[in-house]
Amino acid sequence: WIMGHMVNAIYQIDEFVNLGANSIETDVSFDDNANPEYTYHGIPCDCGRSCLKWENYNDFLKGLRSATTPGNSKYQSKLILVVFDLKTGSLYDNQASEAGKKLAKNLLKHYWNNGNNGGRAYIVLSIPDLNHYPLIKGFTDTLKQEGHPELLEKVGYDFSGNDAIGDVAKAYKKAGVSGHVWQSDGITNCLLRGLSRVKDAVANRDSGKGYINKVYYWTVDKRATTRDALDAGVDGVMTNYPDVIADVMNEAAYKNKVRLATYEDSPWVTFRK
């Protein structure tokens, strides 16, 4: 999965997919009442990027739905996974569950079209704080209450705070999650970060006993870092330059080992060599 980083304006969906991304990451900010409000990152953000692009969250969802609904004039068949980077740092811990409920209602209405031929992309809810694990239950309970438990097949989870793997496992246990887990690791492209925790996550994924199904590394903009990440065995690379990742995947060392995921590749099933 080549994951386009910080895709917060609707026009950027096409821009990143056309550069080679089959997945995008979108920031979600919340208002004081835990309503998802804007697709907005703000300052500071990655070096070389504008931090200030935004849409109203519901408008972005409608644009995303168009891009991921077969038959729509804006349909992009390659776009199969969307990571919502939930900026819950602005919320009190006791608002996490409410944020999950509201997120579920917004997605159900504006993205899934109330279960009636909505967008088809898989969704990852990425949460920066382990203490906000109740967001997951708020989300899953709401989809069930609204009569659409089947849409949970399309939803996965990520804790993005670079916490110890064991602590992340405990948070999932509390949230009642087993499966559909992506584990992120990384840092802004302005700084360097080693691969030791990525390797721990890959080992957990491949042990058959861990909680992780897929691993992604962020933010990867250079060819050398891309090669290191692919060598470490990641499933996804988040990048500001999808074309760079696509180029590396076409190099002799990788073109027979890795390929771009398609809609038929489940993002929840661990790939066995």
UniProtKB/Swiss-Prot annotation:
Subcellular location: Secreted
Organism: Loxosceles hirsuta
InterPro entries xrefs: PLC-like_Pdiesterase_TIM-brl
Enzyme class, UniProt record, top EC level: lyase
Cellular component annotations (GO), alphabetically ordered: extracellular region
Record: active site: 5, 41
Protein name (database record): Dermonecrotic toxin LhSicTox-alphaIA2biv
Domain of life: Eukaryota
Family: Belongs to the arthropod phospholipase D family. Class II subfamily.
